[in-house]
Amino acid sequence: PGHGEGATEKGDLESWDEVNKTVQDSFRKIESCDTKILFGHSFGGQVALYSILSDLVNPDYLILSAPTLGDNYPNFVKKLSSGIAKIAPKLRIPSIVNKKNLSTDIDVVNDYFNDPLVFRSMTARYGREAINTQNFVNDNINNLKTPTILFHGENDTIVPIASSSKLSELENVEYVVVQNSKHELLNQDTRPFVLSELHRWLKNNNII
């Protein structure tokens, strides 16, 4: 899976503007398309929601898979993140992802942890920016008007399913709870079900 090859330092960014630029540059490539769909899994879901809610991009449809509207980092760490980022911006904070909570497929787990492009930690300033944007998304989630399908695994402990509760209640959001699923909805035995539900939603919206 990896986290990309472009970054000079994995799991680090000076400001969220770097993320905004990447999203906008990528979205320009599909702006001429008749139907523009944004897909975001996990942290990518948070990025997609932030980009829409801050009017950076305006897709026609949105597909979300376990977006990070919450997490299992200790509250005291999150509360201290801003101060830590100022004092020690490059202090590394370990990832909460482990071999037990990622996927029900052992091969997927092994591939993930053997991939040199996957980072196992983030800097304090990265964490600060992630928390700030997560808060922005949660505070403004009622402003989301884009037709959306939201998937979340019932047994997800990386991004607790309860964090999708407010988003799932919006009229423009179709919510699909994936039973017996960990975080990697599309990379385990739940993949056929998720793809089937996605196909149904795409057909119902006359996208395919």
What are these model-derived regions, one by one?
Residues G4-I30:
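Catalytic nucleophile-loop/oxyanion-hole region of alpha/beta-hydrolase
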Residues E174-I208:
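Catalytic active-site module of serine/aspartate enzymes centered on a nucleophile-bearing elbow/loop
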